[in-house]
Curated annotation (Swiss-Prot):
<comment type="similarity">
    <text>Belongs to the cytochrome P450 family.</text>
</comment>
<dbReference type="Pfam" id="PF00067">
    <property type="entry name" value="p450"/>
</dbReference>
<feature type="modified residue" description="Phosphoserine">
    <location>
        <position position="249"/>
    </location>
</feature>
<dbReference type="GO" id="GO:0005506">
    <property type="term" value="F:iron ion binding"/>
</dbReference>
<protein>
    <recommendedName>
        <fullName>Cytochrome P450 2D16</fullName>
        <ecNumber>1.14.14.1</ecNumber>
    </recommendedName>
</protein>
<keyword id="KW-0492">Microsome</keyword>
<keyword id="KW-0349">Heme</keyword>
<dbReference type="GO" id="GO:0005789">
    <property type="term" value="C:endoplasmic reticulum membrane"/>
</dbReference>
<dbReference type="GO" id="GO:0006805">
    <property type="term" value="P:xenobiotic metabolic process"/>
</dbReference>
<dbReference type="InterPro" id="IPR001128">
    <property type="entry name" value="Cyt_P450"/>
</dbReference>
<dbReference type="InterPro" id="IPR050182">
    <property type="entry name" value="Cytochrome_P450_fam2"/>
</dbReference>
<feature type="binding site" description="axial binding residue">
    <location>
        <position position="446"/>
    </location>
    <ligand>
        <name>heme</name>
    </ligand>
</feature>
<comment type="function">
    <text>Cytochromes P450 are a group of heme-thiolate monooxygenases. In liver microsomes, this enzyme is involved in an NADPH-dependent electron transport pathway. It oxidizes a variety of structurally unrelated compounds, including steroids, fatty acids, and xenobiotics.</text>
</comment>
<keyword id="KW-0256">Endoplasmic reticulum</keyword>
<dbReference type="InterPro" id="IPR008069">
    <property type="entry name" value="Cyt_P450_E_grp-I_CYP2D-like"/>
</dbReference>
<keyword id="KW-0503">Monooxygenase</keyword>
<dbReference type="InterPro" id="IPR017972">
    <property type="entry name" value="Cyt_P450_CS"/>
</dbReference>
Length: 500
């Protein structure tokens, strides 16, 4: 067969272009509906991919919000997307219309991670019986963790003591606390999943943290959005082989830990941890093809909990210490409350939180100000729904701009500043605000919220009970502007920890 001539090539190119334009027009039809949300005009074949900075999506969405309003539409190649902004619209979408908006979109790149067809996990699971079963199990396991043995609070308290000991080794010298915070939170998750902790210099924990950090960068890239929007590209071997390599390495390490752990499981013994509890449910469900308790779901659930549970809490703690050295008056007030309620002898306990309104307000304000997951996890509509009068068709990817709620000028007195008074009334009592939703809202609210609250309170109070933190002498004042990725990290900084 001979090569195509120039005229033939031109004809083929024109035919392909016409075909792509027709496909593009077909996918744009819903944008012409009377009540479909407005939005920027998509580029044929690309949609609005080039108009969104995926490393700082919240910033892009804020600019588009000023132009198109609280509910606007985008198109990622041929995937319809709606972005919801502001407290009223986000609450309507996630809470009032939760039955319609709690599904998850299919992300084709996830097929490269090596999980079988029965694996959904919890975070990315479709809104249905399997998700309900796994969420119920996970919430119950977190609540009943260590029944008859060490409680989860004991694990966190003991790890806080190890963290303080590690900080003591750096006392008086400038250092970056990020790595130590990562290791401490990693050990809490490891105790929950594997009933074990790692020494801070263990090569396994160092590799886990390295792969997790790289995974954040991978998932923040435009490349991932393009591949999820044009999954046909994943059929190209050289493309598929390079996608999500760090995440695959992270999963492989977790698989190794899981295999080591499972050799010690005994069905007739009380569960040591969440994994044992899952294996027990698998044992009970043998022969039940409808059960979501299977090996592949266990692998994905472990990776979900390890990744999401570790990163968000350690990053928030890193923000907390940064804000304490930038606001020494707030730090002193927290320490005064710690001294009054807890003292310098015993360890902090969760029961102390109710008697420490200022400290509680500071922790909440750290979460609000840091705003570390500004766009949340994407949802998908499972049927036609309405938000703020706009019609959102079934199968639309839905982003909720949580940053627009946490920084809403109509709700917060000083939305762009660190101000613990946002969570205190005139008498100094703690007040939780409706617009405080760093964990999202509705049925898909982060299932690890109770654990995160416990870790933040116990680690934060333990550190400020033992140390005073400051900007190292001779160093410039660090910035309180974050570095946007999938999770907003604080700009690199060092501090000095001085024993009190």
């Amino acid at each position: 067969m001979g090569l195509l001539t120039g005229d033939a090539l031109f004809s083929v190119a024109v035919a392909v272009a016409i075909f792509l334009l027709l496909v593009d027009l077909m996918h744009r039809r819903q944008r012409w509906a009377a009540r479909y949300p407005p939005g920027p005009v998509p580029v044929p074949g690309l949609g609005n991919l080039l108009q969104v900075d995926f490393e700082n999506m919240a910033y892009s969405c804020d600019k588009l919000r000023h132009q198109f309003g609280d509910v606007f539409s985008l198109q990622f190649v041929w995937t319809p997307v709606v972005v919801v902004n502001g407290l009223l619209a986000v609450r309507e979408a996630l809470v009032n219309n939760s039955t319609d908006t709690s599904d998850r979109p299919t992300l084709p790149t996830n097929a490269l991670l090596g999980f079988g067809p029965k694996a959904q996990g919890v975070i990315g699971a479709y809104y249905g019986p399997a998700w309900r079963e796994q969420r119920r199990f996970s919430v119950s396991s977190l609540r009943n963790f260590g029944l008859g043995k060490k409680s989860l609070e004991q694990w966190v308290t003991e790890e806080a003591a190890c963290l303080c000991a590690a900080f003591t080794n750096h006392a008086g010298q400038p250092f970056c606390p990020k790595a130590l915070l990562n290791k401490a939170v990693c050990n809490v998750i490891s105790s929950l999943i594997y009933a074990r902790r790692f020494d801070y210099d263990d090569p396994m924990v160092l590799r886990l943290l390295e792969f997790l950090e790289e995974t954040l960068r991978e998932n923040s890239s435009l490349k991932i959005q393009v591949l999820n929007s044009i999954p046909l590209l994943l059929r190209i071997p050289c493309v598929a082989a390079k996608v999500l390599s760090a995440q695959r390495s992270f999963i492989a390490l977790n698989d190794k830990l899981l295999a080591e752990h499972n050799t010690g499981w005994a069905p007739d013994q009380p569960p040591r941890d969440l994994t044992d509890a899952f294996l027990t449910e698998m044992h009970k469900a043998q022969g039940n093809s409808e059960s979501s308790f299977n090996d592949e779901n266990l692998r994905l659930l472990v990776s979900d909990l390890f990744g999401a549970g570790m990163v968000t809490t350690s990053v928030t703690l890193s923000w907390a210490l940064l804000l304490m050295i930038l606001h020494p008056d707030v730090q002193r007030h927290v320490q005064e409350e710690i001294d009054e309620v807890i003292g310098q002898v015993r360890c902090p306990e969760m029961a102390d939180q109710a008697h420490m309104p200022f400290t509680n307000a500071v922790i909440h304000e750290v979460q609000r100000f840091a705003d570390i997951v500004p766009m949340g996890v994407p949802h998908m509509t499972s049927r036609d729904t309405e938000v703020q009068g706009f019609l959102i068709p079934k199968g639309t990817m839905l982003f909720t701009n949580l940053s627009s709620v946490l920084k809403d000028e109509t709700v917060w007195e000083k939305p762009l500043h660190f101000h613990p008074g946002h969570f205190l009334d005139a008498e100094g009592r703690f007040v939780k605000r409706e617009a405080f939703m760093p964990f999202s809202a509705g049925p898909r609210i982060c299932l690890g919220e109770p654990l995160a609250r416990m870790e933040l309170f116990l680690f934060f109070t333990s550190l400020l009970q033992r140390f005073s933190f400051s900007v190292p002498e001779g160093q410039p004042r660090p910035s309180d502007r974050g570095a946007p990725y999938l999770v907003v990290l604080p700009s690199p900084y060092q501090l000095c920890a001085v024993l009190r």
